[in-house]
């Protein structure tokens, strides 16, 4: 059976953590930032975890992670 391919978009956007979870960046932080409040932009900093309901989909996109 041939090797499964990893989705390039997923490997660029997600990092695998030791416990089996995935780390992701926040959306809505690239452009059109003038109309967003300082509080909103501050809360979009950093990273968060992929939700448990989506972990199975992410694992299918990254079979060797």
From Swiss-Prot:
Keyword list, A-Z: Ribonucleoprotein, Ribosomal protein
Any single Pfam family the record assigns to this protein: Ribosomal_L35p
Gene Ontology biological process: translation
Any one Gene Ontology molecular-function term assigned to this protein's record: structural constituent of ribosome
GO cellular component, as recorded: cytosolic large ribosomal subunit
NCBIfam families: rpmI_bact (TIGR00001)
Family: Belongs to the bacterial ribosomal protein bL35 family.
UniProt cross-references to PANTHER family, sorted A to Z: 54S RIBOSOMAL PROTEIN BL35M, LARGE RIBOSOMAL SUBUNIT PROTEIN BL35M
Protein name listed in UniProt: Large ribosomal subunit protein bL35
Biological source species: Chromobacterium violaceum (strain ATCC 12472 / DSM 30191 / JCM 1249 / CCUG 213 / NBRC 12614 / NCIMB 9131 / NCTC 9757 / MK)
């Amino acid at each position: 059976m041939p090797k499964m391919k990893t989705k390039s978009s997923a490997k660029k956007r997600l990092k695998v953590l030791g416990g089996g979870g995935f780390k992701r960046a926040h959306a809505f932080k690239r452009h059109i930032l003038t109309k967003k409040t300082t509080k909103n932009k501050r809360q979009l900093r950093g990273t968060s975890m992929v939700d448990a309901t989506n972990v199975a989909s992410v694992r299918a996109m990254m079979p060797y992670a």
